Structure formats: C-alpha cells, structure tokens
Amino acid sequence: MASKKAPTGHFSILYFAAASTFTGKTSEHLPAPIKACDLFDTLEDRYPGIKGKVLASCAVTVDLEYIDINEGDAADLERVIQEGDEVAIIPPVSSG
C-alpha cells in the first residue's frame, strides 16, 4: 500500500490492521518534522485511546526501517521524522 506523496512540510503515515480500524483511515499526512518520541503522543491527541489499545503492541517503520519507540532506544527516540518520510504502523505478526 503506497500513499500519495505528502504535501510540502508533511510526512505520510500508513495504518495497517488494528491501527487502520481504530483511525478509520489507511493513511494520512502529518506535519514534519517531528521526533519519533513525540509521534505516539501526536497520534493519541488525534485518536484518543490509540496508544494503549493499538500502538503499545505495534511496530513502527520510517522509510522501511524499523525503529524502537516502545522500548525507548535512545537513537530511535531522537530520530527526526522529516518531510517526505513514510511511516508505517504495523501490528504484531503471528503465524500458526
């Protein structure tokens, strides 16, 4: 799933599975730049309850590179999401 190119001063965010269901969207554009450590708070402001119900168990990628927001890796938390970046919120993967 590719999103439309983000407008100037924004980045794209893709929502999969539970994140898409919770937001009612598959993608949107948010203002850039933003620190990765602030992303979940920004999403919580837009979609109250999403942090605890969805984001706590999701993985996050920035331009297809996994970053660790939940566990607090210092380098990942300080990473700045820039204009034109593509962020994805990915649910846990299971197999059976």
From Swiss-Prot:
Signal sequence coordinates: none
Q: What does this protein do?
A: Acts as a sulfur carrier required for molybdopterin biosynthesis. Component of the molybdopterin synthase complex that catalyzes the conversion of precursor Z into molybdopterin by mediating the incorporation of 2 sulfur atoms into precursor Z to generate a dithiolene group. In the complex, serves as sulfur donor by being thiocarboxylated (-COSH) at its C-terminus by UBA4. After interaction with MOCS2B, the sulfur is then transferred to precursor Z to form molybdopterin.
Q: How does it assemble?
A: Heterotetramer; composed of 2 small (MOCS2A) and 2 large (MOCS2B) subunits.
CDD domains named in the record: Ubl_MoaD
Which subcellular locations apply to this protein? Cytoplasm
Q: Name one GO cellular component term.
A: molybdopterin adenylyltransferase complex
Q: Keywords of this protein's UniProt record, alphabetized?
A: Cytoplasm, Molybdenum cofactor biosynthesis, Nucleotide-binding, Phosphoprotein
Protein name, as recorded? Molybdopterin synthase sulfur carrier subunit
Pathway as given in its UniProt record:
Cofactor biosynthesis; molybdopterin biosynthesis
Gene3D superfamilies found in the cross-reference section: 3.10.20.30
User: Sites of the modification 1-thioglycine?
Assistant: G96
Taxonomy-wise, where does this protein's organism fall, top ranks first? Eukaryota, Fungi, Dikarya, Ascomycota, Pezizomycotina
Q: Which residues carry this modification: Glycyl adenylate?
A: G96
In terms of PANTHER family, this protein maps to: MOLYBDOPTERIN SYNTHASE SULFUR CARRIER SUBUNIT (PTHR33359:SF1)
Q: Which organism is it from?
A: Phaeosphaeria nodorum (strain SN15 / ATCC MYA-4574 / FGSC 10173) (Glume blotch fungus)
What PTM annotation applies here? C-terminal thiocarboxylation occurs in 2 steps, it is first acyl-adenylated (-COAMP) via the hesA/moeB/thiF part of UBA4, then thiocarboxylated (-COSH) via the rhodanese domain of UBA4.
Q: Which family does it belong to?
A: Belongs to the MoaD family. MOCS2A subfamily.
**Gene Ontology molecular functions:** molybdopterin synthase activity; nucleotide binding
Tell me one GO biological process term: Mo-molybdopterin cofactor biosynthetic process
